[in-house]
């Protein structure tokens, strides 16, 4: 019973961490759109909270293994949590990177409307949320949907890269802002990759199937 209680509390901490990551992505995107330096700095400072949560959750996992010597499903869940909090922490770092770029981009007028970037932001926030839920609830179907969304993010990233190249070719003075936007898009793309890792961990936890670096398709397709 003690293991069950501690494991449930640890799961709640993972969900809390995921929500903080989503908030960081949301605020970083808003800071970018509104050229709000103060909000961007808030994201940067808030990353410390995400880092501390990672350390706390990792310690909880080590404690549960040492104290209760869990087996089978409980052990897989604990080891899975230990792994995915690293991905969540990296997502927080990427949100911080977006905020740092937002500060640099606030120095000049926007190069273009951030339509694709905003779309990427919404998708990756959904991926973060759904990947963690799929892991906690061992929902393989939801995990596979998360993995499929990564292709959409990749396509948006490449589409934006082509568009930014056009801006640079039209006027070389655009290169600085285009470079910053390219990095911003790359940071979103990396968040999606980490969410995909979490979803893959969910599938392994539920089915025992290693799906890393594979394209997931529904059975029968």
From Swiss-Prot:
Transmembrane residue ranges: none
Signal peptide span: none
Cross-referenced InterPro entries: P_transport_PhoU (IPR028366), PhoU-like_sf (IPR038078), PhoU_dom (IPR026022)
Superkingdom: Bacteria
Compartments, as annotated in UniProt: Cytoplasm
Record keyword Transport present: yes
Broad class of where this protein is predominantly found: cytoplasm
UniProt KW keywords: Cytoplasm, Phosphate transport, Transport
A cellular-component GO term for this protein: cytoplasm
Molecular functions per Gene Ontology: protein homodimerization activity
Pfam families associated with the record: PhoU (PF01895)
One BP annotation, GO: intracellular phosphate ion homeostasis
Subunit (UniProt): Homodimer.
Function of the molecule: Plays a role in the regulation of phosphate uptake. In this role, it may bind, possibly as a chaperone, to PhoR, PhoB or a PhoR-PhoB complex to promote dephosphorylation of phospho-PhoB, or inhibit formation of the PhoR-PhoB transitory complex.
Similarity field: Belongs to the PhoU family.
PANTHER family in UniProt: PHOSPHATE-SPECIFIC TRANSPORT SYSTEM ACCESSORY PROTEIN PHOU (PTHR42930:SF3)
NCBIfam families assigned to the protein according to its UniProt record, in alphabetical order: phoU_full
Protein name: Phosphate-specific transport system accessory protein PhoU homolog
């Amino acid at each position: 019973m003690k293991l069950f209680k501690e494991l449930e509390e640890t799961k709640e901490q993972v969900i809390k961490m995921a929500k903080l990551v989503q908030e960081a992505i949301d605020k970083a995107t808003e800071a970018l759109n509104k050229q709000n330096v103060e909000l961007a700095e808030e994201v940067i400072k808030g990353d410390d909270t995400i880092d501390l949560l990672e350390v706390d959750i990792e310690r909880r996992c080590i404690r549960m293994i040492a104290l209760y010597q869990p087996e089978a499903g409980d052990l897989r869940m604990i080891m899975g949590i230990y792994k995915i909090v690293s991905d969540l922490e990296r997502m927080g770092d990427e949100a911080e990177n977006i905020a740092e770029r937002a500060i640099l981009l606030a120095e000049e007028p926007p190069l273009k409307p951030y339509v694709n970037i905003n779309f990427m932001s919404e998708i990756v926030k959904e991926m973060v949320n759904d990947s963690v839920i799929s892991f906690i609830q061992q929902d393989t179907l939801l995990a596979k949907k998360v993995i499929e969304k990564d292709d959409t993010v990749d396509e948006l990233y490449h589409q934006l890269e082509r568009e930014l190249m056009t801006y640079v070719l039209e006027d070389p003075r655009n290169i600085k802002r285009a470079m910053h936007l390219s990095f911003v898009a790359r940071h979103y793309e990396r968040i999606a990759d980490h969410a995909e890792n979490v979803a893959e961990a969910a599938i392994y936890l539920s089915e025992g199937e290693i799906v890393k670096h594979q394209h997931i398709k529904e059975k029968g397709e």
